[in-house]
Amino acid sequence: MDRLQRLMMSQRSNMIGAAATEMPLDDTKETVYISSLALLKMLKHSRAGVPMEVMGLMLGDFVDEYTVNVVDVFAMPQSGTGVSVEAVDDVFQAKMMDMLKQTGRDQMVVGWYHSHPGFGCWLSSVDVDTQRSFEQLNSRAVAVVVDPIQSVKGKVVIDAFRLISPATVVRNQEPRQTTSNVGLLNKPNIQSLIHGLNRHYYSLNIDYHKTSAELNMLMNLHKEQWQSGLKMHDYKEKERINLEATKKSVRIAEQYTKRIEEEKELTEDELKTRYVGKQDPKKHLSETAERVLEENIVSVLTAGVNSVAIK
């Protein structure tokens, strides 16, 4: 009985001590918003450094306790050979920040990014030390890891991390509190868990926001120019494309004929919903024919222009 009382008293004292040392925790709703410009610059810098690791700093603002806004990044003159990068060049950083302020970019450093070409998004022991030095300057600093090898068009392999406080681990508390159902955490992979995810650091939500100017920039990335029409295509390849387009047109024409026969037996109300959510054979046939005609007209004109120019 005495032993049970001593055990209950020790648990009570631990609870009182934990309550006395209670401190504000980060929230699982906290999201890192990365602009399109910053994301493109990170990917371009990371791809240029393959197979080496590269790093840079992120500029932005801490809007509130739930939002970290990244508007721009700039590369640092460092590279790594393994899973780590060298220390940050303070002189280069100071000069770069002064030059950016002259151009009107007066945001503060909200964290850093580096690449892991081909081996996923996680933090090595040296990366953890680098992140700890950033968090000594600002406790909300963010470490972003991007993998340029695994990233493909439409899906960027990227993740954001922040260290777990050792005091939280000692008190056996959760590193973050959950106050809303907003936000979606990605399911961690085995590789990240092996390298200390949710033990030494945790992952943050990432979202992307686009302004009207950035949206216009992205729409013009793969926009064809007037020189594209003067490019000659291989005649055998062009013949194969035309043959496939002709076979496709025949199939669509058969579907269109079948559609006309079916429409004779349908009521007016059934006709209105006949092709809702389905492919309209008439519209599809018209689009295919117009595209084939345009491509062949351009091809013939290009061949004529090139033959005259070569003479």
Curated annotation (Swiss-Prot):
- Keyword Hydrolase (UniProt): yes
Provide this UniProt record's keywords sorted from A to Z.
Hydrolase, Metal-binding, Metalloprotease, Protease, Proteasome, Zinc
* Motif placement: JAMM motif: 114-127
Stretches of the chain forming a coiled coil according to its record: none
GO biological process terms held by the UniProt record: mitochondrial fission; peroxisome fission; proteasome assembly; proteasome storage granule assembly; proteasome-mediated ubiquitin-dependent protein catabolic process; protein deubiquitination
Q: What residues bind Zn(2+), as annotated?
A: 114, 116, 127
Which InterPro entries would you find in this protein's record? JAMM/MPN+_dom, JAMM_MPN+_peptidase_M67A, MPN, RPN11_C
**Record-linked SUPFAM superfamilies:** JAB1/MPN domain (SSF102712)
Output the CDD domains linked to this UniProt entry. MPN_RPN11_CSN5
In this chain the MPN domain maps to 32-167
What the entry lists under Gene3D superfamilies is as follows: Cytidine Deaminase, domain 2
Say yes or no: keyword Metal-binding present: yes
The GO terms this record gives for MF are:
metal ion binding; metal-dependent deubiquitinase activity; proteasome binding
- Cellular component GO terms held in the UniProt record: cytosol; mitochondrion; nuclear periphery; nucleus; proteasome regulatory particle, lid subcomplex; proteasome storage granule
Tell me which family the UniProt entry assigns to this protein.
Answer: Belongs to the peptidase M67A family.
PANTHER family listed in its UniProt record: EUKARYOTIC TRANSLATION INITIATION FACTOR 3 -RELATED (PTHR10410)
Q: What does this protein do?
A: Acts as a regulatory subunit of the 26 proteasome which is involved in the ATP-dependent degradation of ubiquitinated proteins.
Q: Give the protein's recorded name.
A: 26S proteasome regulatory subunit RPN11
Native source organism of the sequence:
Eremothecium gossypii (strain ATCC 10895 / CBS 109.51 / FGSC 9923 / NRRL Y-1056)
Gene name as annotated = RPN11
